[in-house]
Amino acid sequence: METAAGARYSTAPSHRGWSVPGTPVLVRYADDLVALCYSREHAEQVKERLAAWLAPRGLTFNEDKTRIVHLSEGFDFLGFNVRHYRSTGKLLIKPSKAAVKRFRARLRAEVRSLYGSNALAVISRLNPILRGWAAYYRTVVSKQVFAQIDHTLVWTMLKWGRHRHETKSYRWIMNRYFGRFHPARQDRWLFGDRDTGACLTRLSWTPIRRHQMVNADASPDDPALAYYWRQRRRRRLPPDTPTAPAPAPYTLRRPQGLA
C-alpha cells in the first residue's frame, strides 16, 4: 500500500526510516487510514493511487468518511484530534471532542445504573473504566481534559448521593462520601467508601508520558530484539499495573518411590 501511494523512506545511516521529503506518510490501523501530504493536489494524487490499488482487491474508499483537510483545521483519528495551531506553531494531539463526549455519556450511564448500589460497588465499577481511558490517552496532551472530567465526575457523584439519600442535604452527602481518602494525595474531594477506605481514582493522577518512536527497522518478529520490545511493553503498562513476576527457576525432583 505504501509503495502504491508513493511513500519512500531514507536508507542513509543517519536518517534511516525517515520519510523522503516530497513523499506521503501513511498511518494505518485496521481499516482506518491517514495519509499526510504536502498539498491538496498531492493529497488528491495519493487518493487516486490508493483507489487504483484497492480496486483489484474489491475495496473502495467510504466517501462519506474520506476527507482532505488542512492540518490547521485538524482531523480526528482513533479518538484523537491532530491539529497544527498557527498561533503557537505547534502540532498537538489531544483526545477528540467526540471521544470526550462519548466518555462523559458513558460515565453518566454507568452511574445511573448504580443508583441503587452502595459506594463500594460504584467505585469497583468505575475505577477500571477510568484507568483504561486514562491509559489510552496518557501519551498525548490530555492533562486539561483529565482535570475537566474529574471535576464533572464530582458533580455526577453528588447527584448519585442525592438519589441514594433523597431526604439528606448536599452537605450531609459531602461529609458522608467525600474527603481525603487517598493517603498519598491531598485531594479533598475524593469520592470514597468510609467503611473500606476505597476511593474513586482520578484521571489527573495519570502522568503524561509521551510516545517513544520505534527504532527504524525494528521488527517485533526479530529474535535479536526481544529485549528491546520487552522494555517497550513494560514502559507502556497502564498506571497502577504491576509487572508480571519473574518465573520461578525450575528444579529437578526425584519422584517418591523411585530409586
Regions found by a protein language model. Give the residues of each.
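Non-catalytic terminal/accessory segments
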Residues: 1-259
